[in-house]
């Protein structure tokens, strides 16, 4: 019997394999949060465009275009999730240009409130 999903437990990391690709559990958690965040952004900012950025090291995960304004968000699975090299640099630099934040489930509402203020005309 062929299986589509293979679960392997390597505490504290969990992996899911589907179609021969392994994805760390932490990445899946971040991805699920990111998908829900995109839904929230589209509901809060009708007509906005949300782009998942290339995986260039350090660039924020999402670019949001709304009217004449833009923002970037770096998604983290939790407030204590490790940052990768250059992430602080790019979030700070893009925040100086417009609006950029690290966002996680613990600060999502706060960041969305700040983004609403930033996107006001």
Regions found by a protein language model. Name each.
Residues 3-121:
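Catalytic phosphate/metal-binding cores of nucleic-acid and nucleotide-processing enzymes, i.e., regions
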């Amino acid at each position: 019997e062929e299986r589509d999903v293979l679960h392997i437990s390597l505490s504290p990391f969990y992996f899911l394999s589907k179609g021969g690709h392994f994805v760390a559990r932490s990445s899946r958690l971040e991805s699920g949060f990111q998908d829900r965040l995109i839904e929230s952004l589209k509901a809060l900012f009708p007509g906005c465009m949300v782009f998942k950025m290339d995986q260039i090291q350090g660039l924020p995960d999402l670019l949001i275009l709304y009217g004449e304004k833009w923002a970037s968000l770096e998604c983290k699975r939790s407030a204590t999730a490790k940052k990768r090299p250059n992430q602080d640099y790019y979030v700070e630099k893009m925040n100086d240009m417009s609006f950029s934040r690290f966002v996680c489930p613990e600060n999502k509402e706060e960041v969305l409130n700040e983004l609403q203020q930033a996107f006001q005309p």
